[in-house]
UniProtKB/Swiss-Prot annotation:
The active site is at residues 25, 144, 174. This is 2-amino-3,7-dideoxy-D-threo-hept-6-ulosonate synthase. One of its GO terms (molecular function) is hydro-lyase activity. It comes from Halobacterium salinarum (strain ATCC 700922 / JCM 11081 / NRC-1). 1-deoxy-D-threo-hexo-2,5-diulose 6-phosphate binds at residues 25-29, 144-146, 199-200, 226-227. GO terms for biological process: amino acid biosynthetic process; aromatic amino acid family biosynthetic process.
Length: 265
């Protein structure tokens, strides 16, 4: 029964085994930044233009459902702030049961492999995965290589992080992009679970799309990108361009043209 539920919920956030999700959980971390003040308008724009799912903290759920259309909804269950002493120290913000009551199709949880808080985060992710499995809810693990002396984009480190996430019970794994198709293939090969890349800091449109294209060519299952989209001058158009790369195998130039965006250098 739980496997059927998990499959059904996975199909609500991705219907072709590829995933474009727009995380909007930055309010805890950074405050009400541009693009998230009127989060309802942003949700409407991105979901109308190809986002498969949006992601927020549980308390934002009432602002999500009236505006997301048919898109899926992922609830994130831990956080830290830029005002705190250690951003790698992610603390629980809810339970799987809270997420289900909030109408989630999946839950997500962040772990920093290599940080001082890694042991506690492994335990917490395992607990979330066990609770989610019991309820038939998919788990998206945000598994990063972060900590003192840790190279956040090293393929071996990222491969370790995604394999850890699989072994603890994640169904989909988000991690940083290693910077090249060849190196990211090693990350993807480290796990049997779908791997999606984080968007990272905003860059030029073509550069962003080329990175996603390269990751997809390496075997990535999609992308989870927030500020690149919701702080874009036209979030809907940027969502459409990314969707073309993820779901239609478009190259950056074709994706930009399809979305009506100017091809930058």
């Amino acid at each position: 029964m739980t496997d059927a539920g998990k499959t059904a919920r996975l199909n609500r956030i991705s219907t072709d085994d590829r995933l474009l999700t727009i995380p909007m959980d930055h309010g805890i971390t950074l405050g009400a930044i541009d693009g998230l003040v009127d989060i309802e308008a942003t949700i409407r724009e991105v979901t109308a233009n190809g986002a498969d799912a949006v992601l927020t903290q549980p308390g934002i759920a009432p602002r999500v459902h009236p505006n997301k259309g048919d898109a899926g909804y992922i609830v994130h269950l831990n956080a830290s702030t830029t005002l705190g002493p250690d951003q790698t120290d992610k603390r629980r913000t809810g339970t799987v049961e809270d997420a289900v009551r909030a109408g989630a199709d999946a839950v997500s949880f962040h772990i920093n492999v290599g940080s001082d808080h890694e042991p506690d985060q492994i335990t917490a992710l395992a607990d979330v995965a066990a609770d989610a499995d019991r309820l038939g809810v998919p788990v998206l693990a945000m598994a990063y290589a972060r900590g003192p002396g840790v190279d956040e984009h090293d393929a071996a480190n990222l491969g370790h992080a995604v394999r850890l996430a699989e072994e603890v019970g994640a169904d989909v794994i988000k991690t940083a992009y290693s910077g090249s198709t060849e190196s990211f293939q090693r990350v993807v090969d480290a796990t049997a679970k779908p791997v999606i890349i984080a968007g990272g800091d905003p860059a030029g449109d073509r550069e962003t799309l080329q990175g996603i294209r390269d990751a997809m060519d390496a075997g990535a299952a999609g992308v989870s990108t927030g500020r690149t989209v919701f702080q874009h001058a036209t979030p809907g158009a940027m969502t459409a361009a990314i969707s073309a790369v993820v779901h239609d195998d478009a190259d950056p130039e074709a994706a930009l043209a399809r979305a009506g965006l100017v091809v930058d250098a």
